[in-house]
């Protein structure tokens, strides 16, 4: 039975997949985000009261959830990416030198 769920959200479209192991789910997360991220660069968006700069916009979000593991990666409108753990209370994962957001998430989730 598939224990880990991968959810990718992009401009109102949600795609879900299930995987048997955490390493499989994280590899699929990296593949999906690498495939979709190049087309997600954005310019400033006009809000009700202010302009929202690309670095403040989450253009693409990928999340992994399963037994003892919950986290994901936000791809910002400027192309940068941040890893986080948790769901309701997201905690950013600090990157070590030379580490990608995907590597940081793997380290944080113990995969």
Where do the protein language model's features map onto the residues?
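Short, mixed-charge low-complexity intrinsically disordered segments
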Residues: 38-111
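Short aromatic-glycine-(Arg/Gly/Cys) micro-motifs in beta-strand/loop hairpins
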Residues: 1-14
């Amino acid at each position: 039975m598939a224990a880990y769920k991968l959810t990718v959200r992009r401009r109102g479209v949600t795609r879900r997949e299930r995987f048997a192991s955490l390493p499989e789910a994280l590899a699929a997360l990296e593949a999906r985000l690498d495939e979709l991220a190049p087309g997600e660069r954005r310019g400033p968006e006009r809000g009700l009261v202010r302009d929202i700069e690309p670095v403040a916009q989450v253009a693409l979000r990928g999340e992994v959830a399963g037994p003892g593991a919950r986290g994901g990666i936000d791809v910002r409108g400027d192309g940068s990416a941040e890893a986080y753990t948790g769901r309701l209370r997201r905690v950013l994962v600090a990157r070590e030198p030379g580490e990608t957001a995907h590597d940081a998430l793997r380290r944080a989730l113990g995969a």
